[in-house]
Amino acid sequence: MKTSKPLLTLRMLFPAAASFIVLLLGEWIARGSLTADTFISFIFPHFGAYLLAWLLLFLVWELLDWVLRIPPLATLGMAVLGCAPCAVNFYTMQLRGEPFLPWDLMQVSEAAGVASAAGLKLQTSMVVSIVLVLALTVASFFVYRGRLRQRWLPRLAGTGASAAALCLLIFGVYLQPAVTQVLGITPDAWMQDRYYRYYGV
């Protein structure tokens, strides 16, 4: 059965739109609020950083979709990657007044116990994010329902291209201070919370 043009267009736009929504949800979770001032003071002046974050989420979705060929799982996986670090950062700031740092991953079990003892609760932003992520996941099922199965060669090529683009973004941009500074992202090791406010988690 031939796929209609509107549906093909929707399938092309869905990953980009879902990644954008998850990016906004992550910022809402990390900051606790997402106001006009947030956009004016932090997001718009550092647009390049948020464009890179969106591109990262988009490429993660594409890679998961090429590997799994199950769009709801690709959507859910991308959303977890986009929102979970933001939630951890929010609670870390609440508990100790310091932002989440990569080496904090080594203390996950300890942090979970402390968070439980401190009586931390789900924030409105987190509840709304869970609902919207579930809605996106369900929507992806209906948008891609009936999609033709890919043969192994195009699937392998798509997986390789997505993985290569993701590696290029991580190792060629994110981990290259000279490149990030050209994009207006300046390292701020002494004030990681300020870095997150400017450029996102």
Label each region the model flagged:
Residues K2-Y196:
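Transmembrane and membrane-interface helices of multi-pass
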